[in-house]
């Protein structure tokens, strides 16, 4: 049952909600308090490219209009300053108001009490989620530290370098790397880097910027969301 599942998820992510419910609440808040509307808002999404995350992004896209994508593997903001600077010039204006809605974050699967696991339609076994992050955690510190750079795998290289300090800490302490802890470590970096990029945007963007970040939990009963930041900048 969904109630039992959410209680299990709350053992690791206490503020979790059903993904769709959470984002509907944020949509109402942005409309009623800050004046966001389809005609004055550009929605930009920085999640992982894994199709398991699509339900909530498609929900938001249906409401706010076509999305700009600045994420990639593992939900890191690979588009960086260039992508977010670009989308800040794509924002529609209506009656003197324009708004930029940024949604981003990492993700992790949960199935039968196991974190980092997710069954997928049409596949007989259970897969990993996030696959990018699971590969790094499974490889371990020495393998990632000594892995040569690959010009055809730059996004994965970026995620590896973000997770490397966590893997080193585990290696030094003798602890086994944990997918939940690695996901949190990645999420902290996403939040820190987006904070810097949004600070840059605020100096040149005359509208409001809503930043919603957090960890999506993928399950066979749908996605859940554990927010880490919900902020609106630039309100007069």
How should these model regions be labeled?
Residues 102-106:
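N-terminal, polar/Ser/Thr-rich
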Residues 47-52, 107-108:
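Short glycine-enriched loops at secondary-structure junctions
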Residues 60-69:
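Short helix-loop-beta junction
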Residues 1-41, 73-99, 109-236:
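Divalent-metal-activated hydrolytic enzyme cores
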Residues 52-59:
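Short, solvent-exposed amphipathic alpha-helices that sit
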């Amino acid at each position: 049952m969904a109630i039992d599942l959410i209680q299990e998820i709350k053992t690791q992510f206490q503020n979790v909600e059903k993904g769709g419910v959470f984002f509907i609440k944020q949509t109402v808040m942005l409309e009623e308090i800050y004046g966001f509307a389809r005609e004055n808002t550009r929605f930009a999404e920085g999640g992982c490219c894994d199709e398991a995350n699509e339900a909530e992004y498609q929900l938001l896209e249906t409401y706010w209009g076509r999305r700009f994508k600045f994420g990639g593997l593992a939900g890191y903001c690979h588009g960086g300053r260039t992508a977010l600077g670009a989308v800040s010039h794509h924002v529609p204006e209506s009656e003197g108001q324009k708004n930029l809605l940024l949604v981003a974050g990492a993700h992790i699967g949960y199935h039968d009490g196991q974190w980092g696991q997710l069954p997928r339609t049409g596949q007989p076994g259970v897969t990993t989620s996030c696959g990018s992050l699971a590969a790094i955690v499974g490889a371990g510190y020495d393998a990632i530290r000594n892995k040569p750079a690959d010009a055809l795998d730059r996004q994965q290289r970026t995620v590896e370098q973000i997770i490397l300090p966590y893997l080193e800490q585990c290696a030094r302490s003798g602890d086994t790397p944990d997918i939940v802890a690695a996901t949190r470590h990645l999420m902290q970096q996403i939040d820190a880097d987006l904070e810097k990029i949004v600070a840059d945007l605020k100096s040149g963007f005359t509208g409001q910027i809503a930043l919603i970040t957090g960890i999506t939990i993928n399950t066979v009963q749908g996605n859940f969301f554990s927010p880490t930041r919900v902020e609106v900048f630039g309100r007069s």
